[in-house]
Structures are given as structure tokens and as C-alpha cells.
Amino acid sequence: MSHTNKIAYVLNNDTEETASPSSVGCFDKKQLTKLLIHTLKELGYDSAANQLLLESGGYQNESNHIQTFFKLIKTGQFHLINWQIVCSLPLAHSSPLRSEWLQRLLIPTPTPATTSLFDHMLLQLQYLQQLMSSVNSSTCSDAEIATLRNYVEIMILVNRQIFLEFFHPVTNSASHKGPHTALPVLYLRKILKNFIEIWDSLLVSNDQFLNEENIFNPETTLRELSTYLTNPKLTAQLNLERDHLIDAISKYIDPNELVPKGRLLHLLKQAIKYQQSQDIFNIIDPDDDASFSSPPHRINLLQDNFSHDLTVTFQEWKTIQDTTDEIWFLTFSPNGKYLASATSESSRGYFITVYDVEQDFKIYKTCVSLSQSVLYLMFSPDSRYLVACPFSEDVTIYDMNATSLPDASATDSFLLYPSTRLSPMDSFKLDTTTYPDDTESSASSSSRPANANSNQSRVWCCDAFHTAERAGWMVVGSPDREAIVHSLTTKESLFSLKGRTCIALGHDENISGRKSIDPAKVLYKPTSSNGNWQYVEDDETFPRVHDVKISYDDKYVLLMTHQGVIDVYDFSGFPSKEELSKQTVDPKNFLIPRIARLDVGKNMTCISLPLNTTHQGFHRQQISESQHLVLVSLQDNELQMWDYKENILIQKYFGQKQQHFIIRSCFAYGNKLVMSGSEDGKIYIWDRIRGNLVSVLSGHSTVMSNSTKPMGKNCNVVASNPADKEMFASGGDDGKIKIWKISRN
């Protein structure tokens, strides 16, 4: 017997194999076999896959129903696709359709051979329309509606393909130049549009069965198909479009009935990413698949993949030094186009420099007419306006789209580039006498502004609302115990939190000794989380506000106070611009609930929210895993990460030096990193989740300027570019702005 035959004999007569269990460890043997067969076919080993199929007893990768359905698509026999075939597909995470629904959809109607495809699909649409008359969300479960919606989506995908194939006519005659425009237009209007309208009506809010990977937007789909009418050349090759249709429908199918495309490779990627995640020097970036797609890089599948090297590097890319004054504040615009810089007091005057990031950081605007040093800068969400909060009582606003006008008579002739001179478009002060809560008690020595001889409050911080409903609004905070909602467009103060707040308590919290508040007087939007809240009077003196942040969905306003706490207010019920314009709600007659208080207990210098990478105008996108995080810089050589909604301290970061000055920190690299300046001139970078220090950069050093004033070596501020996760900037006492780049090894 030859060696080969011996191997075959042993394999065929292995008693251990015949008596083998139905599982291998915790894995199902049938699933493993199906996965191997599927992968062999994807790799082109069809004969080996067929041999394994025979030896395993015929484990099919897809059921007969699925094979029949996909064959109809590949051969273009769409006139044979009906609700009976579609509803026979086994869907993932779905419940069976009601029997009475199936009876209405699966009406046996033999279609004559002469019936057109248009009439056939019109009949399927009519069956669905008849069914929808009995579908009611109040009597049907979300799971039932989700199943019906998935089948409707599959039928829409099929009809979309039918529509596209109008632009690939069968060339029965040489004179045929292309499709008649009337038929695609009619099909889109009479069939596809009605299918999509029904699908839209089946959407369930907060649907736990909604698969984000599979749904498509009806408005986008209609716009896309309408584009094909005007430019039919956009359609791809016929076979390629049918393959895409099969791939799209495959995502709806139960994986136990159809092995997902590339499943084994996907599992291997997950395993390698998990192995790499165990290394504390690995910066996890789920969006980065470069290591799996780079041809020169080969991953060894025969051993574990660990690396003890830092997976990202930080490189100093550019140094800007247009001043010898200390850099106090840096901020990128939301669209990443501008970088604004504010300096300390200067013998040349006070101004803000705005750099054009896209033009190699050339000076774009020099904002003038400031009477004192600027403590805080903020760009509006559309990146058009820059708001400056100086030491003085004036909040100054600049329009980045305005034309720069040199002024020979101006006192700021010291400017390096007079052609970039930009005057304010507006400025305002907070008048503390205009609010009714300035009672004798609130104006006592403990709460009176430090500049008590003035009726205006200083403004040291601000942040803008982000959604379209509150576009042009911002919250300004004052160390003189004020926080006010101000409109940039109408140039008026809309609401003062001082004296207009209450405290929200859970149903299990003790309210004894507290004065209850009628919920009708509270501005809040009822949800499942606040349905059991009780509201009590807030009898505390309004705090001194040193920093303010607004969540990207505009639901929460965070005030960092001088008292060592961060107060979180629920603004979800605050009226929109439309409601205020119609005067349906007067917010001055209501209270804003404080839903949380983060008891940090130490002196804080700034707070930061995660970066929002969507920057095209106004938006509602949330930031998934990190949407309720706030980073706190402490004057105690420490940073803290809190979940402000749950009032939980999540992580602490140590290493940087901060005891005497305001040092600012930020999120970076798609919110995977946390970074901060330091009083030793260095930049400290941590892994956001683990809290370990991953790098320390030598950023800024002690220098002596041309003046007699000695310069410190603080790195006062770091700022990330929200439109380019690989870019951040730092500013220090040496007057330098350094631009840094992050790259993966």
C-alpha cells in the first residue's frame, strides 16, 4: 500500500472521527464545517470544497430557498419573484409573520406568460397595500413590524435592480440605442415610490430590531434613482449590479442558513485585534484596517500577534512663532480650516491671530479692538464666527467671512500683516441689573461681582448650541455668578440660569425638608429616564462659572464652577428658535432642572468634551461610546474622566505638572487619546480607556524674549483638529505654536 493510500485509509477508518462528537470544544462541528466549505470556495478551491461537502454528509452553506432566490436574481428572472419567495427567506433576529398577514401576501395568482414585469410588481405592491390596512403599531409588536419591514426592504432592493436594468436593455435589434425614458419614470413613480412610502411608515422609533448596517434612507434612494434618469451612464455593469444586490440581501439572511461573505477572515481580524489590544502600548483604532490591507505586511496566523512597541508616533510637523508673548489659548474651527490663537498681555496691544490650516498656516485674520488679554475662544458650529472672552466685560464676535480692511489711523499699526486686520462685527456685555433674581440676598457680599462698582459681569467662557433648532445661540459663563443663553443673531440675552434652576431627584431619593416644585413649571422633555423625577427648589447661591460646555445634541449644559463641582443641567425641554419666535413659550416663566452634580472636590482649570467628527453645518449625530464623557483638568497634577450623565468617575490620568497655572487638555485621535499641556513645557499623552501614559513630548522650553520679562516654560494648551484626527497643536510660554502629526506605525 502506497504512502498516499495509507493516509487515505487512516483518514477513512479513523474510529475517533466516526465517534467524534457534534462539537469541537465549545464550537459546533457543523458550523465549523460550513465555514470551511464557504472559505474554500471564496479562495477558489472549489473541488476541495465539494470534497469536504461530500465527506461531511452534505452541509449546505445555503438553504434551497436561498439558492432558488439568488438564482432568479443572477439569471434576471425577476418576473418569478413574488411575496411567497421573499417571505420564505429565513431572516436574522426576526419573529415569524402573522398567519393572517401571510394569507394576504401569498394569494395564489397564476401570472400569464404575457404579463409584463411592470404589471407583476404592481400586483405585489397592491397585495402589500391591502395588508397595510390591517397593520397597526398599537396592536402589533415591534418585532412583528420589524420582520415585515425587512421583507419590504428586500422587495425594494429587488425593484431597485429592476429599475436599473431598464438602462441595460437586451439588444434585440441593432437600432436599439437605449431605454425609453417613459418606462423608468413610470416604474419609479408608480411602484418604487409607493414601496418606499410603505417602508417609511413601518419605521419604529427606538426599535431594538433595527439593523443599522442594512437600512437605507428612502429620501437618498429616491434621489439616487432620479439621478439615473438624467444620467443613465452612472449604472454599472449588469452582472456587477446583480452581485451587489445579492450581497445586500445576504445581510438580512440568518447566518445559520447563509454563511456571511468573508466570515472566516472577519473572525481572524477580530482575533488579531483582540490580541493586539492586550498590549498597553497599542492605541486601539477600530477604523484602522491598514494592517490587514497593506500588501507588504503579512500577519502570521500560526502564532499569536503581540507587539510591545507603540503603535502610533508623534512628530513635530511645523513651528509657528509670530510673537514672543505667551500662548494662552488655541482652538481649531469645527471644519478644521482655521486655528485661532490668543496671547497674554503684549506691549504691541491685544489681538487674536487666525491661521489658515489649508494654506500651510498662513495668517488669515488678525482680530483687533481688544482692550485686554483673551481668556477664551470659541468658533461657531458652522466655523463662521469667532467669539472671544477677554479679561474685560466685553464679549467680542468676529466674522471669518468678512473682508479685512486696513486702517492707517488705527492704533494697531504694529500688526505684522495689516492686510489681515479684522474688526469685530459685534460685542456685548452682560448687564446684571436686567434679571429679576438680583434680590437683596443674592446681591450680598458673598455673591456680588468682584467688580461691584459695575453693573456688568465679566465673561470668561462660552460654548455654542449645535443643532439647527438653536443655531446662533450660545451659553456664556461668568465668575460673577452668571450663566446666560445669548443669541448671536438677535443680539439679545434669552435666559439667565441664575435664580431659574431647580434640582431633579430620582424617585428613590429623599426629598424631606426640601420644597417641592410643580413639574409643570419645569422645562424638560419627558423620557423613560426622567419619568420618575421629582423637582425641588434650588436654594443655593448660583456658583462662579469658570468653564461651560454644551453636549452636541444640545440636551445638556455643563458648568464648571469655582466651588469644585460640575453642575449638569437638562436643556432638552428648552424652547427652540421657532417656539420663541411664535412666543408659544416664555422660558423666563420656567425652571431648568439640574440633573447631576459631579463632586470633583478640587480646583479645576478646564473641562473638555469628546471631539465630534461630523462638522458639516448643524447636526444631531451622537458620539456613541464617549457621548457623555467630560475630561477635567485639575490644579493637582491630575486629570479625571467622568460620565456626567451617570455621575461616575471613570478614569484618572497622572504625570503632568499643574499646580499654579491654567493648563488646558483635550481629547485626541478620534477620542482614543487624552492629552494635556504641563508646567514643565511637555505634552503628556494617555490612552483614554486604560489611563496609561503612552508618550511625553518635549514641546516648549524656557527662553528669554527681547524684553526684560523672563519667559516661563509652560505648555499652556493643546488642541485637536476635529476634521483631521492626526493633527493637534500646542502653545506655550515661549510664544511658539507647534503643529503635531500622529501616524500609525
Swiss-Prot record:
Protein origin, superkingdom: Eukaryota
Location of the region described as Disordered in the Swiss-Prot/TrEMBL record: 433-454
Give the UniProt keywords, A-Z: Cytoplasm, Nucleus, Repeat, Ubl conjugation pathway, WD repeat
InterPro entries named among the record's database cross-references: WD40/YVTN_repeat-like_dom_sf, WD40_repeat_dom_sf, WD40_rpt, WD_repeat-ST_regulator
Secretion signal: which residues? none
Q: Name one GO cellular component term.
A: GID complex
Q: Where is the composition biased (Low complexity)?
A: 441-454
Where is the major localization of this protein? nucleus
**Record localization:** Nucleus; Cytoplasm
Question: Tell me, which GO biological process terms does this entry list?
Answer: negative regulation of gluconeogenesis; proteasome-mediated ubiquitin-dependent protein catabolic process
Q: Mark the WD repeats by their residue spans.
A: 322-365, 369-408, 445-487, 540-579, 613-652, 657-696, 710-745
Pfam annotation, one family: WD40
Listed under subunit, the entry gives: Identified in the GID/CTLH complex. In the absence of stress, the complex exists as an inactive anticipatory complex (GID(Ant)), composed of VID30/GID1, the E3 ubiquitin-ligase RMD5/GID2, VID28/GID5, GID8, and the RING-like subunit FYV10/GID9, awaiting a substrate receptor to form the active E3 ligase complex. When cells are shifted to glucose-containing medium, the substrate receptor VID24/GID4 is induced and becomes part of the complex, named GID(SR4).
Report the family membership.
Belongs to the GID7 family.
Cite any additional comment in the entry: Present with 1200 molecules/cell in log phase SD medium.
Function of the protein: Component of the GID E3 ligase complex recruiting N termini and catalyzing ubiquitination of proteins targeted for degradation. GID E3 is regulated through assembly with interchangeable N-degron-binding substrate receptors induced by distinct environmental perturbations. Required for the adaptation to the presence of glucose in the growth medium; mediates in association with the substrate receptor VID24/GID4 the degradation of enzymes involved in gluconeogenesis when cells are shifted to glucose-containing medium.
Entry protein name: GID complex subunit 7
Q: From what organism does this protein derive?
A: Saccharomyces cerevisiae (strain ATCC 204508 / S288c) (Baker's yeast)
